[in-house]
């Protein structure tokens, strides 16, 4: 891939600014955890796995900012750093997974001096990024096996290299099928209101010379009905124990339409996106974002001033609409509650 979503370089976090794509390919530098938190909140970086990496790197930066003379003081301040970052995006469970992993590293090495702990936290954050790339390629390998030769694939939002350390989850499946020479083509929903499909997915696939056609969100059902879609694959921000899946708003509609038209609908996500503490999707917190994201496009007002707006960033697709969940350890189908627990060794 010709871009890097996020990386640690010279004690700085470097992120591609996804709010400026596709017009400009700009990389921002962050030297403190507050900047990283603002980048997560402001959608400079987005996508559950990428948010988890950013959160971990933000903690590593925060650890370098802490002035303390004991581990207890250091750890209390580290928890404050995690709390600030944790308030940015409540739905993506990878965010909290990354924070907990960083806190665990600090606690496991509390007998070391603080500079050594800071270095271990930096190393852990970098490891999370490295691991994610390998995980996405495994997801792509498992998912590509499900795709038939010449398939037309529909995807929603962006679950690609921009949403991960690289390669992607849903787009990892697409990349895997493309690399296997299956002659696929992709239909990308534009994905209002942030237009991740139009701005990001189309940009990524075009850079990789994967055939892609952009469609408006309300075209998907008609394309399915007229036999133009063979396979649907999306990412996930949180998956409950029963397989209910939170993903970008509009995913539920795609899943229902796919089932109505007898088209397989798959979710592609790493195991870190599972939240087996939640029995079902009704318990997943749904982020509500600013009304201006709906009433404006690039600062231009497109709706009447003062109109009431709902802007949930995510919806929850019940497990009954999901053909299978593609993870780095394989594909889970059917009895999600039992199979997801088995996948993580519970």
UniProtKB/Swiss-Prot annotation:
Gene3D superfamilies reported in the protein's UniProt record: translation initiation factor eif-2b, domain 1, Translation initiation factor eif-2b, domain 2
Keywords (A to Z) from UniProt: Amino-acid biosynthesis, Isomerase, Methionine biosynthesis
Biological-process GO terms, alphabetical: L-methionine salvage from methylthioadenosine
GO function term, MF aspect, one: S-methyl-5-thioribose-1-phosphate isomerase activity
Domain of life: Bacteria
Keyword Isomerase annotated: yes
Residues binding substrate: 46-48, 89, 196, 247-248
Pfam families registered for this protein in UniProt: IF-2B (PF01008)
Enzyme Commission number(s) of this protein: 5.3.1.23
Reactions listed under catalytic activity: 5-(methylsulfanyl)-alpha-D-ribose 1-phosphate = 5-(methylsulfanyl)-D-ribulose 1-phosphate
InterPro entries, alphabetized: IF-2B-related, IF-M1Pi, IF_2B-like_C, Initiation_fac_2B_a/b/d, M1Pi_N, NagB/RpiA_transferase-like
Active-site positions on this chain: 237 (proton donor)
Pathway: Amino-acid biosynthesis; L-methionine biosynthesis via salvage pathway; L-methionine from S-methyl-5-thio-alpha-D-ribose 1-phosphate: step 1/6
Methyltransferase in keyword set: no
Entry's transmembrane regions: none
Annotated positions for site Transition state stabilizer: 157
Family: Belongs to the eIF-2B alpha/beta/delta subunits family. MtnA subfamily.
Family annotation (NCBIfam families): eIF-2B_rel, PRK05720.1, salvage_mtnA
Role of this protein: Catalyzes the interconversion of methylthioribose-1-phosphate (MTR-1-P) into methylthioribulose-1-phosphate (MTRu-1-P).
Descriptive protein name: Methylthioribose-1-phosphate isomerase
Organism: Citrifermentans bemidjiense (strain ATCC BAA-1014 / DSM 16622 / JCM 12645 / Bem)
Lineage: Bacteria, Pseudomonadati, Thermodesulfobacteriota, Desulfuromonadia, Geobacterales
């Amino acid at each position: 891939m010709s871009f890097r979503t996020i990386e640690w370089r010279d004690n700085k976090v470097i992120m591609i600014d996804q709010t400026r794509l596709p017009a400009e390919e700009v990389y921002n530098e962050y030297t403190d955890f507050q900047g990283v938190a603002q980048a997560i909140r402001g959608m400079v970086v987005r996508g559950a796995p990428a948010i988890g990496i950013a959160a971990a790197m933000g903690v590593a930066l925060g650890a370098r900012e802490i002035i303390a003379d004991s581990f207890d003081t250091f750890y209390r301040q580290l928890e404050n750093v995690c709390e600030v970052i944790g308030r940015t995006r409540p739905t993506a469970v990878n965010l909290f997974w990354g924070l907990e992993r960083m806190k665990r590293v600090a606690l496991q090495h509390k007998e070391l001096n603080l500079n050594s702990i800071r270095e271990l936290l930096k190393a852990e954050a970098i490891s999370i990024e490295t691991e994610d790339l390998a995980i996405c390629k495994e997801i792509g390998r498992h998912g590509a096996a499900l795709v038939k030769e010449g398939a037309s694939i529909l995807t929603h939002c962006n679950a690609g290299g921009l949403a991960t350390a690289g390669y992607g989850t849903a787009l990892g499946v697409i990349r895997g099928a493309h690399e296997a020479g299956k002659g696929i083509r992709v239909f990308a929903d534009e994905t209002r209101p942030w237009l991740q499909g139009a701005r990001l997915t189309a940009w990524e696939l075009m850079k990789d010379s994967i055939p892609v056609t952009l469609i408006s969100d309300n075209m998907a059902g008609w394309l399915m009905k007229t036999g133009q879609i063979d396979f649907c694959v999306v990412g996930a921000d949180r998956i409950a124990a029963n397989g209910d899946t939170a993903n970008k708003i509009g995913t539920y509609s795609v899943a229902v339409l796919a089932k109505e038209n007898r088209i397989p609908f798959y979710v592609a996500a790493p195991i870190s996106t599972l939240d087996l503490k939640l029995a079902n999707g009704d318990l997943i917190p749904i982020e509500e974002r600013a009304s201006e994201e709906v009433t404006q496009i690039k600062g231009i007002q497109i709706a009447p001033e003062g109109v009431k707006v709902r802007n949930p960033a995510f919806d929850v697709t019940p497990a009954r609409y999901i053909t299978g969940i593609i993870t780095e350890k394989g594909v889970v189908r059917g009895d999600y509650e039992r199979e997801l627990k088995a996948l993580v060794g519970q």
